[in-house]
Amino acid sequence: MKLIWHHNTWPWGRTVRIIKSDGSAIVEMSFEDSQPGVCYLSGLSVIEPQRRKGIAKQLMLACESYCRENGIFRIDLNSVLTDWVQDFYKKCGYIPIKEENGFMQMYKMI
């Protein structure tokens, strides 16, 4: 799978997007200067016809690899309260923290 990496720097930190080259999937990570060592996974999306083919898992592995290479030890995310979405993150090793405002806060130490 060919991936495109897009980096942005902001006053508060930076973002990294990993995009599948055909545009069918994307994951976005945010790194805030105020929280060194922590990544916030701010979005993961795979278009419906491409789901259940392992693409999301590959993007998550790319995200985790990037984090390890850059001194990040924890990834946080907020998951919608949909069983299959939460099941996916749990299979990837993410641990639920608490439900808040219609989302499940989750994390993984890497």
Protein language model regions, located:
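Acetyl-CoA-dependent GNAT
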Residues: 1-38, 42, 99
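Conserved acetyl-CoA-binding loop-helix of GNAT-fold acetyltransferases
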Residues: 46, 52-65, 91
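Conserved acetyl-CoA binding element of GNAT-fold acetyltransferases
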Residues: 37-48, 104
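Conserved beta-strand-loop-alpha-helix junction that forms the acyl-donor binding cleft
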Residues: 76-86, 102-103
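Conserved acetyl-CoA-binding loop of GNAT-fold acetyltransferases
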Residues: 90-99
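Conserved GNAT acetyl-CoA-binding A-motif
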Residues: 60, 67-80
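A general lysine-centric signal
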Residues: 108-109
